Swiss-Prot record:
Key word RNA-binding present: no
InterPro entries referenced in this protein's UniProt entry, alphabetically: DHS-like_NAD/FAD-binding_dom (IPR029035), ETF_a/b_N (IPR014730), ETF_a/FixB (IPR001308), ETF_asu_C (IPR014731), ETF_asu_C_CS (IPR018206), FixB (IPR023461), Rossmann-like_a/b/a_fold (IPR014729)
Family designation: Belongs to the ETF alpha-subunit/FixB family.
Gene Ontology biological process: carnitine metabolic process; fatty acid beta-oxidation using acyl-CoA dehydrogenase
Pfam annotation, one family: ETF_alpha
Assembly and interaction partners: Heterodimer of FixA and FixB.
Keyword Translocase recorded: no
UniProt keywords, alphabetically: Electron transport, FAD, Flavoprotein, Transport
Protein name, per record: Protein FixB
């Protein structure tokens, strides 16, 4: 048996749902989707869900993760085994841990490939900071996985599909986290996972002000702007949501133009699936050139304006 009888899907990020649903179609005979509202439920059915389970009644001061108890109860009531797919987000990982405990299931994070053999999930993911690939065969009846971005292609919606909708009512957990305040966060409005062309900057760009040169190039060629982890996490020059690497975005664009990025393995595992990699770096020995299809050795601050002018013609 190379599929599970049932798979359960939940995504706290709507843009990740099509990818998870495509994976669900390949891994199980029946697809169940937990959703937070009617619009997400309709989307899940169009993407292939046979049953939609609307999570309902959570007080405003409680966390989405506190639905874990009723989610686990619902999963157990409808089968003695099964697969749970979640996005590899912070909330996805926290929810995976809670579900794993309640289902007595093995949990595997950052899955980059998933297959089923003899009714058991086999998962591969990066280990040792991206230096190797680890493989796990999950022996527990339930398997809870968080899926790295780009693991599956996005499922295409079909408005003719039909499915059944159910309601799962909130039950307060014995121990809960109460939200006392919220603060709006300026988040990335661009879905980099879907970008055809990506210009990504590293600390070699020199300063936050010089990022404007990369933005001008993006505008000239219709690309989206990304960055390395140090630019986002250390220098705070760009948003966390835009950094590429093993612990965040895993991209597969047609073109990845790396500007001032050294090319450490932790970054390249997030970009190495690109169809074409073009690197600009003043260090001719930078590791990025081992991955690049094309490269220019030189100062990015001087090269970017010339490249933008040439491509804008």
């Amino acid at each position: 048996m190379n599929t599970f009888s049932q798979v359960w899907v939940f995504s706290d990020t709507p843009s990740r749902l099509p990818e998870l649903m495509n994976g669900a179609q390949a891994l199980a005979n029946q697809i169940n989707a937990f959703v937070l509202n009617d619009a997400d439920g309709a989307q899940a059915i169009q993407l292939g869900a046979n049953h939609v389970w609307k999570l309902n009644g959570k007080p405003d001061d409680r966390m989405i993760e506190d639905y874990a108890g009723v989610m686990a109860d619902t999963i157990r009531q409808h089968g003695a085994d099964g697969l749970v797919l979640l996005p590899n987000t912070r909330r996805g990982k926290l929810l995976a841990a809670k579900l794993g405990y309640r289902l007595k299931a093995a949990v595997s994070n950052d899955a980059s490939t998933v297959s089923v053999q003899d009714g058991k999930a086999t998962v591969k993911h990066m280990v040792y900071g991206g230096l190797a690939i680890g493989e796990e065969r999950i022996a527990t009846p339930y398997a809870v996985l968080t899926i790295s971005s780009g693991t599956f292609d996005a499922a295409q919606p079909d408005a003719s599909r039909t499915g059944e909708t159910h309601t799962v009512e909130w039950q307060a957990p014995a121990v809960a986290i109460t939200r006392t305040a919220t603060q709006a966060r300026q988040s990335n409005s661009v879905d980099l996972d879907k970008a055809r062309l990506v210009v990504s900057v590293g600390r070699g760009i020199g300063s936050k002000e010089n990022i404007a040169l990369a933005e001008q190039l993006c505008k000239a060629i219709g690309a989206e702007l990304a960055c390395s982890r140090p630019v986002a996490e250390n220098e705070k020059w760009m948003e966390h949501e835009r950094y590429v690497g093993i612990s965040n975005l895993m991209l597969k664009p047609e073109l990845y133009l790396a500007v001032g990025i050294s090319g450490q393995i932790q970054h390249m595992v997030g970009a190495n699936a690109s169809q074409t990699i073009f690197a600009i770096n003043k260090d001719k020995n930078a590791p990025i050139f081992q991955y690049a299809d094309y490269g220019i050795v030189g100062d990015a601050v001087k090269i970017l304006p010339a490249l933008t002018a040439a491509l804008a013609r």
